[in-house]
């Protein structure tokens, strides 16, 4: 869709003119007057219509792009992009009925973790380390915790050392800290066209521009990354190459090798988010091992152990250590010592390995269940992934399906929440199979989804 005649109503807007234009643009997008994929007027045309300078419109579009409202590409134009976010009712504090099945947020299934946390905290409370754990620690983490982090990272096949590992307050904190260390405000970061929404939040906080890169059924396309890098403006590539969220693709080795060479050729930092990699046995080597001099490898305990631990680990090139440590100091000062100590105990005594094996086995079983119960539907995923994409039949829109599913007592997430591309987002929803505590809840949720797929979309035309 094209709306080259769009002219904002600035009468109700306040502040600098460029910001007023960006605010009006946001208002028209929210109101539905500018749907996703709408092509906007050129800088010059809008400046002529508004009787302002081209520089003012350029600043307005840059501000709108920083907010995640639009994306532009030289030679193609400027387009409205999706701005949906994951709307997990549990995180929003919405009251959930006892029969509601939440498949919205990627969380590992819970088993013996509460009892293990209670036991571990009792042991820490009775240990001689307790007093020290209540004090300030090094910004990068205690030596013992960095050593445990290095051991945990080494499970992926990446060679590292405690000197190259920093302890963070979750994988999300690691993403923001690394991006802060390798970019400046206004820089461009390449990402998959479908990507983890947390990187959008980090980019907005740091005033970074996200440039979506095309994918196929195997993941990121190296030739698309190379084409983007040839423009000379890309400072970093953020990617989830193993059990990608939300597509669950595993990037083949040959593409990883190609990305490493492209990054070297163009001086691009590689930010590898591997929070799901623990679920895959014998997967391809991490990107960080293929281009170690420019790679940042991120993992955490949120998916492998428990989200409430909020402990992450990041492997960095030695020369970048102090910059990432400075970002941690500026944001969290240090990861919570008590939780870091608990994670270290679990890594050292084998508890973490046992939890991983339990989660692997359960996810494989739940994936098999989903494919049996949704047989006949188009599904994208991997047998080891905690999530999958359900592609919707003709007539359904992803947002309408999400709303209808919620009314039927099951939470799913429209692919719009992950989409940064310039065209219409994939007409699919993500199902997170690890969230329900019991497998019987997964069955109940999948039954409701299967029943909804059999209903004609016309029955839900009340969803706007």
PLM segments and residue spans:
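Hydrophobic residues in well-ordered beta-strands that form the structural core
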Residues: 191, 212, 272, 343, ...
């Amino acid at each position: 869709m094209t709306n080259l005649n769009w002219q904002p109503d600035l009468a109700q807007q306040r502040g600098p003119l460029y910001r007023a234009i960006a605010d009006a643009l946001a208002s028209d997008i929210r109101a539905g007057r500018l749907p996703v994929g709408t092509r906007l007027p050129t800088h010059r045309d809008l400046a002529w219509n508004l009787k302002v300078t081209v520089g003012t419109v350029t600043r307005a579009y840059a501000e709108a792009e920083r907010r995640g409202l639009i994306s532009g590409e030289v030679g193609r134009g400027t387009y409205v992009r999706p701005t949906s976010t994951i709307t997990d009712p549990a995180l929003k504090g919405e009251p959930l009925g006892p029969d509601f099945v939440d498949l919205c947020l990627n969380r590992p299934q819970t088993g013996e973790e509460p009892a293990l946390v209670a036991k571990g905290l009792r042991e820490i409370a009775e240990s001689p380390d307790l007093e020290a754990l209540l004090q300030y620690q090094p910004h990068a983490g205690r030596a013992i915790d960095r050593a445990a982090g290095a051991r945990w990272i080494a499970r992926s096949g990446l060679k590292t050392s405690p000197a190259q590992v920093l302890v963070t307050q979750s994988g999300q904190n690691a993403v923001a800290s690394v991006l802060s260390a390798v970019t400046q405000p206004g820089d461009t970061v390449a990402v998959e066209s479908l990507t983890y929404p947390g990187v959008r939040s980090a980019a907005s906080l740091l005033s970074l521009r996200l440039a979506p890169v095309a994918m196929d059924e195997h993941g990121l396309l190296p030739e698309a990354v190379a084409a983007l890098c040839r423009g000379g403006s890309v400072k970093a590539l953020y990617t989830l190459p193993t059990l990608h969220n939300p597509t669950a693709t595993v990037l083949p080795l040959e593409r990883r090798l190609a990305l490493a060479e492209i990054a070297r050729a163009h001086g691009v930092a590689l930010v590898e988010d591997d929070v799901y990699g623990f679920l895959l046995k014998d997967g391809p080597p991490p990107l960080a091992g293929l281009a170690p001099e420019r790679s940042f490898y991120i993992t955490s305990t949120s998916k492998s152990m428990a989200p409430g631990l909020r402990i992450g680990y990041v492997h960095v090139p030695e020369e970048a250590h102090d910059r990432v440590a400075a970002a941690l100091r500026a944001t969290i000062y240090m990861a919570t010592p008590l939780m870091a100590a608990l994670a270290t105990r679990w890594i050292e005594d084998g508890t973490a390995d046992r939890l991983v094996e339990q989660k692997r086995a359960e996810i494989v079983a739940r994936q098999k269940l989903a494919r049996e119960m949704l047989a006949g539907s188009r599904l994208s995923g991997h047998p080891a992934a905690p999530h999958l994409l359900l592609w919707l039949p003709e007539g359904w829109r992803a947002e309408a399906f999400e709303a209808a599913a919620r009314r039927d007592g099951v939470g799913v997430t429209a692919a719009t929440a992950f989409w940064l591309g310039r065209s219409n987002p994939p007409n699919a929803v993500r199902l997170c199979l690890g969230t329900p505590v019991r497998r019987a809840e997964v069955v109940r949720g999948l039954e409701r989804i299967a029943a909804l797929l059999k209903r004609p979309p016309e029955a839900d035309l009340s969803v706007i």
